[in-house]
Every structure is written in structure tokens, then in C-alpha cells.
Amino acid sequence: EAISEVFKQVEINQQVAHYSNPVIDLRSNRFIGNIYRIQQRERQNVAEKYRNEQPVGNTLCLDIKMETGTGKTYVYTHTIFELHKRYGINKFIIAVPSIAIKAGTSTFLNETYVKAHFKNTLGYDAEINVGVLEAVKKQKKGRKYFPTAVRAFVEGSRLNRNKIYVLIVNSALLTTGKMLTRNDYDVTIEGYDRPFDALRSTRPFVIIDEPHTFSRDQKAYKAIISELTPQCIIRFGATFPMTTIGKGKKKTTVRDYEHLLYDLNA
């Protein structure tokens, strides 16, 4: 609920390409006020030092601190459904640190009981189409095809109003190999011959699982920012990266929160 309220009364342009998310007006002055009001609520448990009116840059960053074992995957799945219901956001990329977590996330999203819960118990009239990006085995000579999961994600249409498209990717695939950076595939997607460019064109929302493994100076995070240029990054985790602020004697190390909306202590 808190994440959805960040976008309250912010201008959202729905007149976009059928394969793209609506365009959020990231210059809106409403973001700062909305975020600060959410942080002030007692139930959000956000410490005073983390309540601040930070400006929004080219990407809106939102942080949710949840201890391990408190239902993080469930919460961000709920967030996906709610953002789709309220604002028509239907393209989400979930970045995870490992192949094991990637498999676990995919299993959760595809579970029959999970689908039934969100549809029958919570009343969301939408279905998540789950794609999992896998490493491609070295191809022999012949035609080079776009990664199947990327194609399905990008080509997913907003005209299917009850469909949400999710692509799960582990961090190594964002930085190693040429699968997402090469531009010599034989077939293009929506006019794009490079997978990263095709993904960027969807104006995705990115969910980062376990943000301490995606620090700002790490290659995978840099790839998310520079190659995907998401409209919004939402980080869910028990531990967040550290960052150094100040100079000289005032230099100190603090948690690298950006717009912390919730702090759930176990």
C-alpha cells in the first residue's frame, strides 16, 4: 500500500507503445511530499534520520527493509499486483543475486495456491506471466535468436489488460557474456536488435531482491541503471549496502537507503 501511495496524484501517461509501461512523470513535485508523509507514519517504523525529502532523479528509488523470513517475496508480489491495478504498470524485472533464488522466485510465482490467493482471496483480476532469463549455451553456426524470455517479456502487450509480465534475472547474467549486449541476432524485437535496448524500451520497474548484493559500485547495479534505465527501482531486503558520506573528520559510513518506506524488524 505504501509503495502505491508514492504515485498518488502523480501524472502518468498511458498513451505509449503497446509493449511499454505507462510513463511516470518523475519530475513531479508530489513524490517528495507523498514519500515524506508515508515515512512519518508510526507503523512504517522509519527512523527519524532516514526521513528526508530527497529529490527524485532519473530513476525513482524506493526501499523496503524486511528481515529474512518475513515474507519478502509475497510482499513484492503483492506490490506488483497493486501497481498494475492502480496505475497499469505491467512490466517488472526482478533482479536476484543467485540462480537458486531465481529458481525459488519462479516457483513461488507459478504456484497454483499463490495464483489462487491473489485472485480469489485478494481479488486481483490479473495474471502474472513469468519469464526466467537463463544462460544460453554456445550456439553452433547458424541463425542467432533473441533469448526467448526477453522476447516474450518485451512483446507482452498492454492491450491484454489482465496480464502482467515479469522477467526474473540473476545478477551474473546482467554483466557476463554477450547475450544481452550483442546486436547480431537474426531477428529483431519491436525494431530492436540488442536485448538490453529492447528491455529498456519497455520502461520497466525493477525489483531488487537482497540489495546488499547490488551495491551502487557493483557491476550488476550499474548495468541496471545504464542499460535498463528503469523508471523505478524498488529494493526489498534485510540488509542494505553501506555508503560513505562527508569528508575529513566528518566522514562516516551509513546504510545506503534511498526513500526508505518501511522498516520491519524481526
Give residue ranges: language-model regions.
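ATP-dependent helicase/translocase motor core
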Residues: E1-T70, Y74-G88, T107-E111, K115-A116
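Surface-exposed intrinsically disordered loops and tails
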Residues: N21-Q54, E134-A152, N183-P195, R216, ...
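Extracellular/periplasmic catalytic domains that process cell-envelope and extracellular macromolecules
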Residues: G57, L159-K163, E227
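Extended hydrophobic secondary-structure segments that form protein cores and membrane-embedded regions
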Residues: C61-G69, Y76, F92-P97, E127-A135, ...
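Conserved Walker A/P-loop ATP-binding site and its immediately adjacent core
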Residues: V75, G88-E134, S171-L173
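Inter-Walker segment of RecA-like/P-loop motor cores
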Residues: A116-D186
